[in-house]
């Protein structure tokens, strides 16, 4: 999910085989209705091919759902798949000794945070994630701003120290 620009589990679960053309997944975000196109990196394509639905009669790209989209059965299957996925992620986090609980949204937040640390503009991050506004994206990034500011301050102080030729210690 992190390799797919932090795609939410709900969008991943409802992806159709027809949404994948060559190395591009095109879909509409279920939450906002915004159309998105994700160009798959070679790493992402390897994972898509590994986990894609092998049932030729299923319209879904991944084997989370069996029932027709829009039915109560499909929604129930989605809820069960999400619960199972999150339980497996929590177990993985415990096995790895992570202090924080992992969830499907961890991948989404990780993508946004990593993009921010790579100094990608929040507007690009917002667009990539299909947010309705940059304000939504900023709520993801707010906890990390002070750390970035501290890092910037350290760089400035180090630069001044080097430029002062040892006058500042």
What are these regions (language model features)?
Residues 18-26, 98-100, 120-139, 164-169:
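Short, polar N-cap/turn motifs at the start of nucleic acid-interacting alpha helices
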Residues 29-33, 68, 129-154:
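Catalytic-site neighborhood detector that most strongly recognizes the C-terminal catalytic loop/helix
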Residues 86-127:
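Short, basic (Lys/Arg/His-rich) helix/loop patches that form interaction surfaces
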Residues 10-13, 125:
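Alpha-helix N-cap/helix-start motif at helix boundaries, enriched for small hydrophobics
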Residues 4, 14-50:
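Conserved tyrosine-mediated DNA breakage-rejoining catalytic core shared by Y-recombinases
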Residues 50, 56, 64-72, 155-169:
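C-terminal secondary-structure termini that scaffold catalytic or DNA-interacting sites
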Residues 26-39, 72-81, 99-106:
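Short, contiguous acidic/charged loop-to-helix segments that flank catalytic cores in large enzymes
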Residues 1-7, 114:
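Short pre-functional
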